[in-house]
Amino acid sequence: GFLDIINKLGKTFAGHMLDKIKCTIGTCPPSP
């Protein structure tokens, strides 16, 4: 449903933010 889409977008956005934070700290995996 619509909420499922919102949840997926939220998780994806949160995941991207976490990746950016990890990269800032220097612990992100190398980009493909």
UniProtKB/Swiss-Prot annotation:
UniProt source species: Aquarana catesbeiana
Coiled-coil regions listed: none
Family (UniProt): Belongs to the frog skin active peptide (FSAP) family. Ranatuerin subfamily.
Keywords: Amphibian defense peptide, Antibiotic, Antimicrobial, Disulfide bond, Secreted
Organism domain of life: Eukaryota
Any one Gene Ontology cellular component term annotated for this protein: extracellular region
Record's subcellular location: Secreted
Taxonomic lineage: Eukaryota, Metazoa, Chordata, Craniata, Vertebrata
Tissue note: Expressed by the skin glands.
Disulfide bond positions: C23-C28
Role, per record: Antibacterial activity against Gram-positive bacterium S.aureus (MIC=60 uM). Shows no detectable hemolytic activity towards human erythrocytes.
Protein name: Ranatuerin-3
Gene Ontology BP term (one): defense response to bacterium
Main location: secreted
